[in-house]
Every structure is written in C-alpha cells, then in structure tokens.
Amino acid sequence: MSASLFWKCSCPRRITLCPHWRPCQRLRVSLRHAPHLKRCAATLRVAAGSHDVPLAWPGLAHFLEHLLFLGTERFPVEQGLMAYVRAQGGQLNARTCERATEFFFELPASAFAGGLERLCEMLAQPRMSLEDQHREREVLHAEFIAWSRDATAQRQFALFDGLHAAHPLRAFHAGNRYSLNLPNNAFQQALQQFHREYYQAGQMVLSLAGPQPLEELRALAERYGSCLPSGQHLEQTAPPALMTTGNQTYQQLSGQRLDLLFALERLPAGATAAVDFLCTWLQSAKPGGLLAELQQRQLAHSLKATLLYEFAGQALLHLEFDLTSVAASAPVQVRELLTEWLGFFSAQADWAPLREEYVLLQQRQIEVASALELSRRDSRQAADGLDESGLAALKQVLKQLQPQAVEHFSHDWRLPPANPFLRSTIEAPRAGLIRGQTSAHRGLRTFAQDRSRGRKESSALSFSQALPADPSGSALTLRWQLASPAPMGLHARLLRSLATLRDDARQAGVELIFTSCGKDWLLKLHGLPSPMPAVLLQALKALGRPAESFWQEQASVNAEAPLLTIRQLLKAFSEQPQPDSPAQPDPEALQALWASARWDGLGLALPAAIQEALSRTLQQMPGTADATLCRPVPAGTGQQWQNLPGSAGEHALLLFYPVPSASLADEAAWRLLGQLCQTPFYQRLRVELQLGYGVFSAVRQRNGRTGLLFGVQSPGATVTEILQHIAQFLEHLPEQLQALDEPSWNDQQQALAQQLQPATLPLDQAMELLWQAKLAGHSSDYLPQLQGCIEALTPAIVIQAARQLREAAGGCSALANRPCPGTPWQVAE
C-alpha cells in the first residue's frame, strides 16, 4: 500500500496548511519555495533512533542507516543516492540521533528528481543482503574504534555520567562488531522488524526546499513519496526520569573546563524554542550579561549554552565554561553569578524586547540559509519565534532552573542590547585625519590625498562580475601577506578577540572568518551584503588597533579537545601552518607587522552601493594595498612528505596530486577525472578493503593550484599499506575509465559542466573557485573558459590525465601522522 500525504507549504511571507491532515495515517510533507535559492534539498526524518531499538541489540538503528545506502535492486550502489549526488556535485549525509534518524541531500534543480527518487527507493526497498551487512559492520566497527579514541566524543559522552543509570542516554548505542550479531536469527528478525515498523509513512516527515514553485515541489513529493510504505504513527516509548536524586543539576570539572548540566522534566509544548531562546541570551557577551560579568571578574573566558537532549517533555541543558584559573573557588563563584542572572532574567515581564529581537534573528537565519539548512529546519518544525506556548514553556524552564526568587543582586544586571547589524547598516566613515594632524587641520587635507589612497585600495580590491549582484548573498575575501612571522600566538589572540563580533555578524546573516594560510592572513565575509561594511569596519578596528584590554587579558590555556586525526590533517592541509616568531605579542610588534604587510582582496556578487561602502571602509585597512601580490605558483615535481607532529592515533594519510600544468584544459581534464574517481575509490578502499570509515577523494585547490586529494584514516592498516592500496587503485584507474560506456561519459561530463553555470553555482563554491583563480593568475572569465574546456573533453584526454595521475606528473604532497617511509618520498622542507 502506498503512502498518502498531508501538507505544510511555505514560501516567503506566506505559510498555508492544507486541510487534509491525518498524521496518524499519512506521510507528512513540508514544502518551502525560496526563489533566491540556487539548489534544492530534501530531508526525510524518521521518528525512530538509537533509543528505540531493542536493548539486546545496541547500535541497530545506526547500522540500519548505513545499510540503506548500499543500494537496491533497482539502484545498485554504483547508481545509488551517494554516487548520484557526488556525480552531480551535490552533498548528502545521514544522522542517527536518540529518537530520530535524518537523511538529507542537496542538488541542482535539474538533478533533484533523481535524488528524491533514489532516497525514497532506498528507504522503502533496501537490499540488506548478509554479505553487505558483514562489510558494513566492519565499517561501523572502525567508526566505533575511532569514536572510542576521540577525546571530544568521549568527553561529550561523559557529560551524561550524572544521569539516572536507567536512562538510555547512559547506555552504549554506537554499535560494533560484537553488539551486531549478524548470524543470530533473533538479530536479523529485530533488524527487519525495526525497518518494517518505523520506516513507513506514518513515522516520517519529508521536507523539500528549493526555488521551484510550490506546485512543482508538491508534484515531486507526491510522485516519489507515494512509494513509501503506508502505516500508522507509532508512539515512541517514554524514557525514565533523567535524575532520581531530587537534585536536578550536577557539575563536572576538568582542569579549567567547568560543565554544568540541568535536567528538566515535564516540560510543555514549545520547550525546544524556549530553551533556545534562553541559551541565546544566556551566552551573550554583551555588557550587563552573565558572560560579560564573568570576564570582568576574570572568572571565565567563554560560556557556551547547548540543549543536549529533548524528548517527551524532558530536556538536558549544558553550560560549558572555560575558566580563567583552577582555583577551587572559581566554580562556586560561577554558580553564584549564574543563580543571580537567572533570578534577574526570570523577573522580566514576558521579555517583549528580547522576543522581538529573537524573531528578527530567526528571520535572518532563514534569509541566509541554504536549501539544505532550510529543509532540515523544516523537518524539525523549528519555531520562527517564541509564541504563547513557547512563553509558557520558558517560564516552566526557568522555574525548574531557579526554584527560588533572588531578592538581592550583587551586580547591576541588564538585558542585552539589540544587535547593531540586524535593523540597519552603519555608514562607513569617511577618511580620517592624516597622521600628525589635529581637528584644526581637517580643512587642509586635500582631496588628492583621499583619492590617491582610494585608488590604491580600489586596485588592490577587485570585484568579480562572474555572478550578478545579489542582495541575498555576497562574498568578500581580504588577504594580508606578512613580510615576517607573527609573534607567538598573536593570530589566535586576535581570533578570540573577534568572538563577540562574529556572533553579532552571524546573527545578522554574515559569516566572519579570520584564518591563516601559510604566510597569509585571510579575512572572509559571506552572507547578506547590507551589514557587511559595518561588520568589516568593526573587524578592521579590532585587528588593526585592539583595545588596551586586549593586551591585558590572560590567554586561555584550556586546550581544545583534539580533532579526529584525518580532520587534523585536513586542517593543516588548508592552513599550511608556519612557525611563529618567538617574540611576545605587544602593541608595537603588531603595528610593525601591519606596517610591513601588503594586502589585496576579491569581492563577489556585491551590489554597487555596498562596493562603494566597502571601498570607504577599506581606508581603515592596516597594511599597504598591493594589486601585484598574486604570482602563480610554479608547477612542482617530486614527492614531498610532511609529518604532522602531535597527531598520533589511528594511521591517517592525505595525498595531494596537483595538475601538471596551469592550463585550463589540463585543469578541466583533472576535474572530470576527480569526479569519476570518487565512487570507485570509496567503493574499493572503504567497502571492499574495509580500511576504515575515513575514506574520500575530491578535487581541491591550494595556493592557486588545482589537484586531486585522497584521504584515508584506518584503525588497522599502516600508512605504508594505505600508500600501497592507493597506488594499486591509481594503477588500474585508466583501465576502469576505458571500460565506461559512452552514456556514462556524457552524463558525468554534462553534470560537471552544469555545476559551473552561474545560475546554479552556490556562492561559497563560486568564491573559492574565483579566489583560487586569482591566485593562479587566471583571467576574469575563468569560469566560462573552464566550462568550455570541460565541454570539449574526450575520453582519451581524461584517460591520459589518469595516466599522469598514476605517474604523479605534477608531483605529489603527502601529509601524514607517521614519518616519511623513504624513497621515492623526500621529507618536505
């Protein structure tokens, strides 16, 4: 029996609910029409997760999520959703949570129907052969080993130690070789029953978001959603109490990290929005708030408030503090101030100003969200504000957090002021005085001086016309090339000083990123263009001349938990860290660094008025404008090996093979080669050889050079063995490509060419492509030229590129957590 559907349709400024709503019998469908989107996304959320499986089979839900990607009779794995999305340049993932499992992907509109068809097919008709199960169980076991060795994951799991032992949050749910007893008939029956009971329409929500009209989205949902099995909605079993000791809070202290956890029970509808509302203001660093007072008293550097868990009226609130010292009195003082602030916050009358601000924050997040983010948001039925039910839930949350009223306050608490970037933009100031002038000399400043500086800045900052101006999304990248190494830890301190500004900018729809890449410092802004000049102005002030308090602050010594090894390697590959100067950072050292630095930049899709405002703002830019910074990096040769220190753990390796030349024809061939590599590389090393779950290949660009990046993290294979497996794969790659039929070639070639069309190219991808093209010295029509080169490719050209790859014709760079294995590899200088 096929599924029937009920609808929730939304488009800008209009939400309508269709009348036929039978949640106990029908697939729930949410549709969002957003004309500014360049891509489409689908999220299918199943109301069943790790806590819903039989106690005898921990990990079964996560295991099933993996199995569903292994193909169906109609779409075998090489034609399934994962391979299809990769070939179309999209993205996909899945996530098994405590009480839900999500499957989601994003694709160009032209390929969206094929993705939705494969998604619904794989959930409704999985193959789940025993052979597939054995292979995938080993992948899960590798994941489990990595999880058990990952400090961040273990620290997160340990947060639940204070809960009632019978609560499922305390249990093991990851799944491994021993908990997934495949030969046992009882396990196989449980697996089939879990899929049959929960993977049916009554237990699902399908959310679609894209630029198509609602009628088109609805037709897609009807066509492909109807293939899902029909069924009744099942009530999930309510868990036991989070805590049974009477005290609903506990703390954990490790070094300078303080974790406070609060168990909340019997919460009404609207609790998720209520806790999010509370967390928004609780962790605000604005003057008069809790974090500002903690920083003022030098008790804590940072505060992060998170809802760790929410289901059936239960919630677990987590407050993470980065303390400034290990003094025994610090946690006590932090809790006392928290109690005061909660008392102050609870005493407010319905929080009208903050509720208005919160609505604006939610609206702004919707404005700048991608199709994938919108579909995931809609699948969770996230609130757009704090309505009356949310207000009632907030009062209940605060009552449980702060049972007794606070009568006397030791501090003059204040509600956070409005975000300055949300309601209006700040006019960038005109040029100030020349060094040495006073206000009395202002009339003596010549327009020629202003124009001269402006011309230099304008020539150093170029505005690409590759994408049209877009009031819904623009990008700006600024680069400083440092003449000498920065003083020790200076970049990290500057980055921390931008934290409050980054939060305000993000709330206003602008992502602000300050990072390093080799000898360069990069400042990137991405999102709504209207707040960008004001955000940039504040960033340049903070970076160019930090406040006196910046130099007086005690540096945070609470080290971040290490990333997974493969992620450490990827971070190092991107940032190319350089040794700092041993000099201590001080105001004089910073000004000397800026005085010798040169800068340039690139803007994309910026409206003319914003370009003008940014040009004025850049008069505050430290360093010297220089339009000649981009010099193409010469093609390399040889095989260089770099060992990343301090990244011990599972064996992990990245191999980067640059294109042998700077010609766009060669780049086009290698880009198509990279697309053709993805699925067979993953299939060979992850599925067949079962090296581990951290297996990928992709086209990457670094320092203006395009190449193919291969990555593997394995709990069993050594780095030398991983090298051998990759070499064997590359050895047979030309033969594999020769076996492809003509339709497969044409489909892949057409898909790659379409990904570069301005109408469908996402802003962040376009910006990265154009920035790397600038570094490589390509002309302004790089994108159409590259697209033309891709369309002109023949199989013979790509197969020749595969032979070049096999021979490392453009050289090869290895980044690993093990020493150089010797010839033909050389230790990188």
Curated annotation (Swiss-Prot):
MF terms in GO: metalloendopeptidase activity; zinc ion binding
Pfam families in UniProt: Peptidase_M16 (PF00675), Peptidase_M16_C (PF05193), PqqF-like_C_4 (PF22456), PqqF_C_3 (PF22455)
Enzyme Commission designation: 3.4.24.-
Recorded superkingdom: Bacteria
Pathway note: Cofactor biosynthesis; pyrroloquinoline quinone biosynthesis
GO biological process assignments: proteolysis; pyrroloquinoline quinone biosynthetic process
Cofactor binding remark: Binds 1 zinc ion per subunit.
Entry binding sites for Zn(2+): H62, H66, E143
Positions annotated as active site in the UniProt record: E65
Swiss-Prot/TrEMBL keywords: Hydrolase, Metal-binding, Metalloprotease, PQQ biosynthesis, Protease, Zinc
Cofactor list: Zn(2+)
Gene Ontology CC: cytoplasm
Signal peptide: none
Family, similarity comment: Belongs to the peptidase M16 family.
Record's function text: Required for coenzyme pyrroloquinoline quinone (PQQ) biosynthesis. It is thought that this protein is a protease that cleaves peptides bond in a small peptide (gene pqqA), providing the glutamate and tyrosine residues which are necessary for the synthesis of PQQ.
Protein name according to UniProt: Coenzyme PQQ synthesis protein F
Native organism: Pseudomonas protegens (strain DSM 19095 / LMG 27888 / CFBP 6595 / CHA0)
